[in-house]
């Protein structure tokens, strides 16, 4: 699509890059179950800001975790929820050590267990005020779920495919707030969204409106565009023979 690879990316690929007009993936929404998480269960006061990161463990990079802790430090009335498939002890040690090195109390971290069904996982996302993306390996499915649930997201954009997934998805739902091109912008957006409930509400409204208009939530349209691309590829192949 126009976003997931930079314009100069072709030199790094032996295959010819073929750009679809809007998005390289689309889904017709998600099933959402009944939430099983409440703030009081996690001993989190109702008047605080909750950040969440739900990517799988291999996407966690210490540098990105450090930026997330810097956000927490600048938003004192905040907590950070961490979930995702990973070795529990390793993840807790990673976050706890970096939090302490950045002057953030480990008591503000919560490590969430896995749930029985994906629909429950999505419902539980509603506990978060802001989702913080991973870098240099962004979320993909987790980002789509976040956008579908209408939760503001902060993502750091890089040069490679895996660091531009969330950027492309956000552009396709018409949300630029939270897209960061530098580490500094990532922290700035995280802090700003944590401190501005009105902005969070505006972004959430945009995301929910996008369910009716965005190509990201229109699998039929995407399929037609993909089929058209296949025909164009075949035509070019035949003409070049």
Residue ranges and their predicted role:
Residues 45, 55-57, 70-73, 77, ...:
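C-terminal amphipathic helix plus adjacent low-complexity
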């Amino acid at each position: 699509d126009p976003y997931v690879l930079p314009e100069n990316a072709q030199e790094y690929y032996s295959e010819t890059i073929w750009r679809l007009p809007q998005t390289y993936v689309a889904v017709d929404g998600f099933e959402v179950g009944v939430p099983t998480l409440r703030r009081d269960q996690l001993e989190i006061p109702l008047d605080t800001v909750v950040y969440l990161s739900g990517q799988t463990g291999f996407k966690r990079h210490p540098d990105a975790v450090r930026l997330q802790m810097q956000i927490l430090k600048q938003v004192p009335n905040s907590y950070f929820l961490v979930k995702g498939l990973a070795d529990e002890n390793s993840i807790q040690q990673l976050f706890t050590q970096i939090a302490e090195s950045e002057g953030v109390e480990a008591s503000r971290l919560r490590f969430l267990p896995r749930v029985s069904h994906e629909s429950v996982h999505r419902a539980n996302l509603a506990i978060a005020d802001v989702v913080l993306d991973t870098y240099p390996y962004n979320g993909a499915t987790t980002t789509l779920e976040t956008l579908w649930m209408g939760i503001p997201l902060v993502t750091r954009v890089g040069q490679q495919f895996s660091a531009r997934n969330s950027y492309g998805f956000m552009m396709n739902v018409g949300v630029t707030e939270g897209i960061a091109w530098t580490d500094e912008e990532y922290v700035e957006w995280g802090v700003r969204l944590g401190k501005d409930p009105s902005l969070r509400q505006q972004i959430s409204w945009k995301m929910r409106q996008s369910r009716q208009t965005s190509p990201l939530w229109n699998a039929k349209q995407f399929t037609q565009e993909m089929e058209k691309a296949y025909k164009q590829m075949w035509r070019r192949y035949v003409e070049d023979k």
